[in-house]
Structures are given as C-alpha cells and as structure tokens.
C-alpha cells in the first residue's frame, strides 16, 4: 500500500467517496445521515465573516522594520531606542469605500496599516495614503461613509449623495483636493505614501511629551494613474494592485518604505491659524520637517489570505509604552470603533488569532467567550490576589499624567476651523498639470450631479481660490459670478 494523504472529515475520519452523496437506492432521495455531505455544506455556509464596513478590499504582506535613527529623545518605545533594532511587521493596504471584490482602480483613499510585533506588545499604525480626512469629529464618520456608500434603495453609488454631503461639510474641501487629484487613483500599493492622518503623543523617559505625525515614503516613488489609465486597466483587470504586490514579493523585488516623524512641541500648539490636532489639516513638510525613523521591507506573502489579510485587525489605540493618542476628535472615536468592528466581524477572541497575537507574552484574566483556543489553566482568574505565580500590575508601565486643555465639557464647536486655508495651500503647491487633472476629475465626476449641489461646492472652491472655482465652473457650464458675489 502506497503512503498517501487521506481526505478526511473535520473529525479526522477518512472519506471514501467525495463525489457522490449517500442516497436511498440508486434513484432515491439523499439521506440526512450522510455526515460527510452535511458537514461539508454546513461549513461552506459559514466560510465567510462579515466584510469590513470600510477597507474591505485589501492586500497584505509580512516583513520587517529596521530602526535607522534612535528616537529616545522623543519616546521610550523600546523598538525605537537603538539603531539597527528589527521588528516583525504585517502591512495591509486597501481601498476604503468599495466592497471586497471591487476594482482596485476606483477613485478612493488607500488604507495603509502596519502591525508591529514589538517585544513590549503590539503597536498598530493605522493610516491612509492621503494626509487628511473628510471630517474632524468621529460623530460624523457614519454620515460621510453612508454618503459615499451605495444608495440604500438602488445599491448604486451616487455622486449626488457624497457631493451633497461635501457641499454642506466645508471641512472636507482639503480632502477633496487630494482625492480628486491623480493621487486618488494610485498605480499600485508599492507606490503609495502613508500618513498617520492624526497626531499622536510620544513621551520619553524624562516624561517630556511631544505631538507627532508619521509618514511613510515609498522607495519606489509615488506613482499615480490618470482617469483614462485607470479605466484602461479596469477594463482588463480588477486586481491589479493586489497582483502587483504579490508578484513583486514572489519575484524578490521587495517593496520598501522609509518612515519619518514630524514633531510639534505642545507649547507651540496655538501658534498656527489652524488646530494641528484637526484631522482635516495637514502638517506640511516645510513647516514640520521630516526626521527619518527607519525602513520597512515587505518580503513574504501571506500563506492564507483569509487567516491573515482578512482576519488581521488594527486599532490606532493599540500603542506601546511611550505613545499615547492625541485629543484629535476623529481619532478619539476610532479608538473604540476599530476594535469593536473586529469583535463583530471575527469574534471576541480575534486577538488570539496568530496574525493578531503579539509576540510578547500575554497574561490577564480575560477568558473564555466564543471560540477561544488559548488554554488558561490557572484557578485564579481575578486580581488583586495573594498568589505570587499570578500576573500583577506593574506601576512602571502606568501612563504618565497629561494636561487637559479646555474649561468645560460639552458639545463645543471646533476652534480655528480654517476650512479652506489648507486646501489653498494644496492648490498653490500643485503644478499646472496637477491642477488641470484635479479640475478635470471633478468635472467628470459631476456629469450627473444636480446644479444646486454643484453651486454649493463651487462656493467652497471659490473660498479656496477663485481660479479653482472658475475652472471647475467653466467645465460644468455653471455661471459662477452670480453665485459668489456675496463672497467677494
């Protein structure tokens, strides 16, 4: 008898016939006692978990991060203390709005998330390729996503919906200037930049706090597609970015990104005409210089997309010692929402999955729940306790006290909204070709948008730069002058 691998049930019992169901005679009905059939169908019915409400379409890879410059003057995070320190990572890139099998050529921000498996526990970088977002407060997150998702009656994405929302949300204007540039249609995941979008706090061993933003810069350079190029690719292929990333790694052409930090002293927080902790505002490099931190190299593809790329969970609040979230209102909401969605999608024990499990030891009294596979055998499942063998809190790791800004609690309007100043900065920094692409992409997207919605958006664009509004209006046949007289 030859040595062969038997096909088995999930109970380990060898299967003799995987081609025919068990029936009552040659022409009779199928029997419910056919365990092989019932198990196979029942498992198939449950193969999928709910897709992510945002960032459903994604590709990922394993790799390493090497610290190139010590950050000890800013943070006590151990993996950033010494040059040459290597940290395992898993990175996931994604589109934001569209479903799991949608084309990767669609105009959309790109998610850029990295899980660092540090010796002090996991650290999640959760960002996008674009440096700002549509809104500044998490209470509006469901609304902006609903506007961009398909109409719940037709299941068709409708420009009238999201442009209506944008027109009444002037803080979104800077994001529009990025998203409707060609950077809204990147050529590949290997050629996108990454931004933390939010500011975070770094704390060093002396207790000094600074605000930081983080930036990833691809060594391959930033490469984008025109609308026409994206359409040509989409006619042939829905998966071009995932395929490009996978094949590059398989061929040994490992993608790399340099990580940079921008630093702001808290005493300078009020020295700007905008709030630096507002997610709709950028920290431009000439004002906040980049400092090189290290380099990420992705060198191994997942062995199982579902178990790794689909099951990985990120949260911007997953931080190691020496890092804290800032007071950014959008960030504050994400701290809850991101882990909550993984508990819904994957289950309460999603952190026990290998892709999410830290390399650092885990010791606590969080037990049981749906489908646990980590065995916790101690009879002591409470704390404090008098047993020296059980895990105890360590005051060395207590979070440092932080100053609270503001006088009263309440639903307060954001200070220094400056909704158009940064959009003007972006417009001024664009080349003639980049301005032309931005205008064309908006005009094309407005082909079926109602005129009243166009006018409200044009009024916003006019407050960015009259030329910007004038060029978009000319492309859409709107008489701009009669709608902006009160803005002059």
Predicted region positions:
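Active-site-adjacent core segments of small-molecule enzymes
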Residues: 1-488
